[in-house]
């Protein structure tokens, strides 16, 4: 028997590929009989195929420990290594290596983390049993040495797999050959998939949290304020399940949320939230599209645009399955393309086809589980119902007007750079502005900040000498007065319409006695009840009385003094020229807007005029009547409160129409019915005490406030004695006959 020439304690051999394909699955080095006998002279032939014949292979400065077996069909000076071992050791065929006997120092492997993939990359196959594969690793490679990065092959269920050692932990601190350890039946094998692998296997690795969020984000840096609760809701519903490993979610039988709808008034930050969600997440940027941009003039192209948005998610899910990354698709102005099917008149059907295509892509026959579709709209009521069901856009988050704390956050965000540049004066108090700007949206608060800055800029500019402006950045200071002027300049869309209320009470309110005192106290009591009571979030009050007795003025005064953030008046004057349907829609919109504010007051003036009541016939609009009847009794959404104050001059008509039951109470607004009340009114209208006393002597029958004011003003236009003129006007208008 000829031996290869020894080099010290080792022999020099040339690397060759294994002759037998089955040798690739043993993770052993194969030696000629002569070389094996030289290194292991005392090993009996029945032990040739055990894993306890260890050799050390030196490749340059690197050393590798393997189990060895003899092969009689090899050249005398060669060593056979599998493709996996050659790739791991970075050696090629015919390269010379040094091999020596290795006396083991058994470092028992406590646990070994191994990644797995098909030997043929990109292959897909049936689901594999992880426990069966782990069992084969223990059986096939028991007593073999392993270390980090080592590659080896195994067979299971007629499939071949490549495995790579990701980590090795020993039970004891090794005395030599650190990083190497021997597999034993007690070794815990932790199996995981290689990156990009398509293998279908339930891994048993530690439950690692998916780091889908970046670690350094916060609301203020993102430019989002006042939406802490909304973000918590979004995180819980849409992202919490995605943090857990797919295997855990699959065990629970839970599907990820695939879509959410952000809705609310304009300017509240819906688009901003959706855009910033992409910055919160690790990985790819979201696709942001405007609803109208989906539509195309060519037949079928609109539907193709929808499919193209989901194409990347489809490809990755087919390639990676549950390990696919999250694809976010954001639709701005969703109501432009997803109106309820069948609601369009004279339509070509493209709109309905787009809705159908979107429904199929989100949750159709071949649904995707790696997408999150975010839609935004101001008109949730226009969206097709099928799109809002669970499995599609199932999470509905209302982005409402910010509260006081939220408004302060928004002010801080939009003045952050001013603070950094020391451009805010010391008297600026953002908390006060947040308290003042009730029902301002985020966009309107930004408008306030820009308006305040414009006042600061204007102080540095001489309008008479614009060409020679000397810019001194250090002199630009935004002060408290700038913000106060800006707040009066920028009015909220969902705020109080003070100008409208002032026109209803131009002459103010005259307290003419105990009767009016009681009436005013009752009205204020209802206001306080709505403010403080949690049991009555909705209160409807009817003010009834003769024309001109001051019902509208009293209703406007109660609404204005309530200091509710949202106050509106629905008056026949504002709906002049509208048809019945348009009037009903306008009335409904006012009430819908009121539900977006924490506390609201709506004044419905002259109900009989609104419903177009005419006694001849009689004739009235049943559509408007039923609209009012429903809205007067509808409970606002949770957390919202509404006070409705309506006025009428014909309560009997309303009773016949069965609308009186919609009101919690009816307050009668009386006319001036006593001489004492008449005297008080005259005094409040500018009479001297003597003139008021004399005028009261003319009083004989009830009269309304409006009539008294008209007569007083007419008397003042006449020449001569004012009291005589006043008496004459009373007689001319036959007021005594009332």
Swiss-Prot record:
Keywords: ATP-binding, Chemotaxis, Cytoplasmic vesicle, Endosome, ER-Golgi transport, Hydrolase, Magnesium, Membrane, Metal-binding, Nucleotide-binding, Protein transport, Repeat, Transport. GO terms for biological process: cell motility; chemotaxis; endocytosis; Golgi to plasma membrane protein transport; intra-Golgi vesicle-mediated transport; phagocytosis; protein secretion; SNARE complex disassembly. It comes from the Eukaryota. InterPro entries: AAA+_ATPase, AAA_lid_3, Asp_de-COase-like_dom_sf, ATPase_AAA_core, ATPase_AAA_CS, Cdc48_dom2, CDC48_domain_2-like_sf, P-loop_NTPase. It is an enzyme of class 3 (hydrolase). Its cofactor is Mg(2+). Binds 1 Mg(2+) ion per subunit. ATP binds at residues 507-512, 547-554. Its EC number is 3.6.4.6. It is found in: Cytoplasmic vesicle membrane; Endosome membrane. Gene3D superfamilies: 1.10.8.60, 2.40.40.20, 3.10.330.10, P-loop containing nucleotide triphosphate hydrolases. GO terms for molecular function: ATP binding; ATP hydrolysis activity; metal ion binding. It catalyses: ATP + H2O = ADP + phosphate + H(+). One of its GO terms (cellular component) is membrane. It is a peripheral membrane protein. Belongs to the AAA ATPase family. Interacts with syn7A, snpA and snpC. Required for vesicle-mediated transport. Involved in endocytosis and endosome-endosome fusion. May be required for transport from the endoplasmic reticulum to the Golgi stack, and for the fusion of transport vesicles within the Golgi cisternae. Required for cell polarity, locomotion and chemotaxis. This is Vesicle-fusing ATPase.
């Amino acid at each position: 028997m000829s031996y290869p020439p020894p080099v010290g304690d080792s022999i020099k051999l040339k690397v060759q590929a294994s002759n037998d394909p089955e040798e690739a699955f043993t993770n052993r080095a194969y030696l000629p009989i002569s070389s094996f006998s030289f290194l292991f002279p005392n090993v009996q032939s029945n032990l040739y195929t055990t894993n306890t014949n260890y050799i050390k292979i030196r490749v340059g400065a690197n050393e590798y420990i393997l189990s060895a077996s003899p092969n009689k069909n090899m050249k005398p000076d060669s060593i056979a290594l599998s493709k996996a071992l050659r790739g791991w050791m970075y050696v090629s065929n015919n390269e010379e290596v040094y091999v020596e006997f290795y006396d083991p120092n058994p470092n028992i492997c406590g646990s070994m983390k191994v990644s797995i993939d098909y030997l043929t990359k990109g292959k897909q196959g049936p689901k594999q049993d992880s426990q069966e594969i782990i069992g084969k690793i223990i059986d096939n490679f028991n007593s073999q040495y392993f270390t980090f990065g080592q590659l080896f092959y195994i067979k299971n269920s007629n499939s071949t797999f490549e495995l790579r050692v990701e980590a090795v932990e020993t039970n004891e601190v090794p005395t030599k050959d650190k990083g190497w350890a021997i597999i034993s039946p007690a070794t815990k094998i932790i199996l995981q998939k290689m990156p990009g692998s398509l293998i279908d296997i339930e891994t048993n690795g530690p439950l690692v949290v998916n780091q889908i969020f970046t670690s350094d984000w916060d609301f203020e840096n993102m430019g989002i304020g006042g939406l802490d609760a909304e973000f918590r809701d979004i995180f819980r519903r849409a992202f919490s399940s995605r943090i857990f490993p797919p295997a855990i979610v699959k065990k629970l039988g839970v599907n990820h949320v695939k879509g959410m709808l952000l809705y609310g008034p304009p300017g509240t930050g819906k688009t901003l939230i959706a855009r910033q969600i992409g910055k919160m997440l690790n990985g790819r940027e979201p696709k942001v599209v405007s609803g109208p941009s989906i539509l195309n003039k060519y037949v079928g192209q609109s539907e193709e645009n929808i499919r193209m948005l989901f194409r990347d998610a489809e490809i990755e899910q087919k390639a990676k399955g549950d390990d696919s990354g999250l694809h976010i698709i954001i639709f701005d102005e969703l109501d432009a393309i997803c109106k309820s099917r069948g609601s369009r008149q004279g339509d070509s059907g493209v709109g309905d086809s787009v809705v159908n295509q979107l429904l199929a892509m989100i949750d159709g026959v071949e649904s995707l589980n790696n997408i999150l579709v975010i839609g935004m709209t101001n008109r949730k009521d226009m969206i097709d119902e099928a799109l809002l069901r669970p499995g599609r856009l199932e999470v509905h988050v209302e982005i409402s007007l910010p509260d006081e704390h939220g408004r302060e956050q928004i002010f801080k965000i939009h003045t952050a750079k001013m603070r950094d540049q020391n451009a805010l004066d010391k008297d600026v108090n953002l908390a006060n502005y947040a308290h003042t700007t009730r029902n301002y949206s985020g966009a309107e608060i930004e408008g306030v900040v820009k308006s305040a800055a414009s006042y600061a800029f204007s102080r540095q500019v001489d309008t008479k000498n614009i060409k020679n402006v000397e810019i001194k950045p250090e002199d630009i200071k935004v002060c408290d007065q700038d913000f106060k002027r800006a707040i009066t300049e920028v009015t909220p869309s969902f705020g109080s319409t003070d100008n409208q209320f002032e026109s209803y009470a131009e002459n103010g309110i005259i307290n003419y006695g105990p009767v009016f005192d009681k009436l005013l106290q009752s009205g204020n009591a209802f206001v306080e009840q709505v403010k403080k009571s949690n049991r009555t979030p909705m209160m409807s009050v009817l003010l009834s009385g003769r024309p001109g007795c001051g019902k509208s003025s009293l209703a406007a005064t109660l609404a204005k003094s309530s200091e509710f953030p949202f106050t509106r008046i629905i008056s026949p004057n504002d709906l002049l020229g509208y048809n019945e349907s348009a009037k009903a829609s306008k009335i409904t919109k006012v009430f819908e807007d009121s539900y977006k504010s924490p506390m609201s007051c709506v004044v419905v003036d002259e109900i009989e005029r609104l419903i177009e009541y005419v006694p001849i016939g009689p004739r009235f609009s049943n559509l408007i009547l039923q609209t009012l009847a429903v809205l007067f009794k509808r409970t606002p959404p949770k957390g919202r409160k509404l006070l409705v104050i309506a006025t009428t001059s014909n309560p009997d008509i309303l009773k016949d129409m069965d609308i009186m039951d919609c009101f919690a109470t009816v307050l009668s607004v009386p006319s001036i019915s006593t001489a004492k009340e008449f005297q008080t009114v005259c005094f409040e209208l500018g009479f001297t005490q003597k003139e008021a006393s004399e005028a009261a002597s003319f009083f004989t029958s009830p009269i309304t406030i409006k009539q008294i004011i008209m007569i007083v003003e007419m008397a003042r236009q006449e020449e001569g004695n004012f009291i005589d003129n006043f008496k004459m006007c009373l007689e001319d208008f036959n007021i005594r006959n009332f």
